[in-house]
Amino acid sequence: TRKTTPGLRYLEKEAVKIGGGMNHRIGLFDMNLLKDNHVDFAGGIPAALTRARDYCKEKGKHLRIEIETRNEDEIREALATGIPDRIMLDNFTPERTRKAVELIRGWEKENGKHIEIESSGGITLDTIRDYALCGVDFVSVGALTHSVKSLDMSFKAVKE
């Protein structure tokens, strides 16, 4: 959502839907997404997840919580809290993604809680299939909104 054109977010998101894509978020008001900066400022993944959960409870907000992870250690930290509803695998290769999916699915079996998995970062329309075949629930392709090429059109008026 941060990579949409200012003032045009809803139109760009609608265009993705019309083209067959799905939007899982419009902004931070409909799902908490804890990115690396949030994690760093909070003092780590467990602290960021705990603060997000506690804030939602305190404010009476029923928002799902997604955490961005950059490696297996961060995935393990997130899983150890039992808090996230979704784990984002940021800039993972397909091979690292497969290993991460195995780790998360194994945790699910042991703990009885389903956690959605999202691949994101550097994924293109040419590589999306490689990530989808790893068993993730969602694949984000930012190019659908931030790298769209404009259609060259013109309109001719005919005087009758």
Across the structure, where does each feature detected by a protein language model lie?
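Acidic/glycine-rich phosphate/pyrophosphate-binding loops and surrounding catalytic core
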Residues: 1-66, 70-81, 86, 95-103, ...
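Short secondary-structure boundary segments
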Residues: 90-91, 121, 143
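Cys/His-rich Zn2+-binding cysteine-cluster or related metal-binding knuckle/ribbon modules and their
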Residues: 125
